[in-house]
Design a protein with these regions (language model features):
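Second-shell loop/turn segments in exported
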Residues: 1-5, 32, 53-62, 105-114
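Catalytic-core regions of hydrolytic enzymes
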Residues: 1-33
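Loop/turn elements at helix/coil->beta-strand transitions in domains of secreted/extracellular proteins
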Residues: 9-14, 42-43, 81-82, 99-100
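Structural recognition of the beta-strand scaffold that forms the well-ordered cores
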Residues: 14-17, 45-48, 85, 102-105
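Solvent-exposed loop/turn segments at secondary-structure junctions
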Residues: 20-25, 51-54, 91-94, 108-112
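A short, glycine/acidic-enriched catalytic loop
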Residues: 23-57
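Active-site-adjacent substrate-binding region
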Residues: 60-87
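Active-site-adjacent mobile loop/cap segments within catalytic or ligand-binding domains
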Residues: 84-133
């Protein structure tokens, strides 16, 4: 689906693969939250992969990492404690599809829909700020 949309809309600059994380065990679930303006939100985690040896054909990994760092910085500036540490490692999920492709985890299965939705709205503001400035 992503490739079909990229072909149909070649001006797409950002592809976000959005998920909920799974942390903990069945007996001990983790619910990462922060509070902004008196309202609880699900903490987010941005994942940025790399391909330092060129084996995966993931040429844009450095640009994606730079984009991830900008979003992380903007989100923390606007909404302190919104983000968990950026996850940077030798993986590529769907981040290789184009420059500006990232995987973002919004909370976990233990967070409420309201917490995840609130964070999604704040995250959208942070991403828009990065793209427009």
């Amino acid at each position: 689906t992503v490739y079909k949309n990229l072909e149909k809309y070649p001006d797409i600059k950002v592809v976000i693969d959005l998920h909920r994380d799974a942390i903990g065990t069945d007996e001990n679930k983790v619910k990462p939250v922060f509070t902004y303006n008196g309202k609880k939100g699900a903490q987010i985690m941005i994942l940025a992969g790399c391909d330092t040896d060129g084996e995966r054909g993931f040429d844009c990994w450095e640009e994606n990492l730079n984009f991830a760092l900008k979003i992380q910085d903007k989100a923390e500036t606007l909404y302190p404690d919104m983000t968990r540490p950026l996850n940077f490692d030798y993986f590529a999920y769907n981040e290789y599809v184009c420059n500006g492709s990232l995987l973002i985890e919004v909370g976990t299965e233990s967070n409420s829909i309201d917490e995840a939705t609130y964070s999604g709205s704040l995250l959208g503001n942070a991403i828009a700020d990065v793209l427009l400035n």
